Amino acid sequence: MIRIPFKRDGFATEMKPKISGNNLSLEYDNIESSLMKVGADIARTLPQKLIDRLVDNYLAGNAPEPDATALDYLQRAMLHFSVYEHLIFLITRVSNDGVTVKKNDDETTAYKYQTDELKNKLITTAWFWMNLLIQFLNEHLDDFPEWAESDQRKAFFELPIDLNDFNRWVGVALAGGEYFMMCAGWIIREVWIDCVRSRFPEPTKTDAIARAVCYEVMGRATLRLAYSALPEPIRIDIDNEMGKNHRAQADQFIKEKVSGIFLSKAETYWNALDLEIKKKEMDEDRKNAGDRPLLGERNFTESDKFFYT
């Protein structure tokens, strides 16, 4: 069962301060399906026990601290994600007359560049609040055992590459980056096994390894993660390619093109690591060869009665 920290009565008035640009006419029923979808997505990032606790406190109407702060951050993140998910339905009208857009004397639809910017801001702001929520939970572990003991948190802190690495090498923002790390955690572990452990039986993270991993992860994430789960550098690259092609190309083709840029850079860095490994192996072989005794040395004297050559 999907549980979300919202209720139908008074939704627009209560949630207006929590989401930028929300019109009072935007009622719960308008975006319920997207709220539920986002609720299901969030449950794959945060433990269900924590979500249940916050939802129960919200529905009871008396959320104490620190639950009230965590609940506020969660609602803000979910609202921005939900409006992003529902945006096309808010722009268009589907009826027996077909698919139309709303236009009257007072209002008209936004231009494409405006909706593109809106999508990016909705995702970026949602990431911001998810980041604050994760940080808040980590700062109050004693108050939130549902989070402290969760598999999600353990998996996050066991990742071999951290957010600072992604910020340094591929520009993933520190503000909101925790959400990307949790969404892409399985890809990070996959790359570490496929590309690092296959080269180094007992690997130790270095700048060269971290850089290669970050580019490889970004390339794979571009193809496998939802657009809203991708960091801003990738979203901008995809949007730029969309603009060049005016959507004449399929979305998958464009994602493959952007992915290929990251994977090509990653391959360069993996090749450099392979050369370094080969160089060390050759140096070791030379060292071992110098330590071995010479074989086949002839040491004959006149007292030898005979010998074979």
For each feature predicted by the language model, list its residue ranges.
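Conserved short "hinge" loops at termini or chain/domain junctions
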Residues: M1-R76, E85, F89-C214, M218-T309
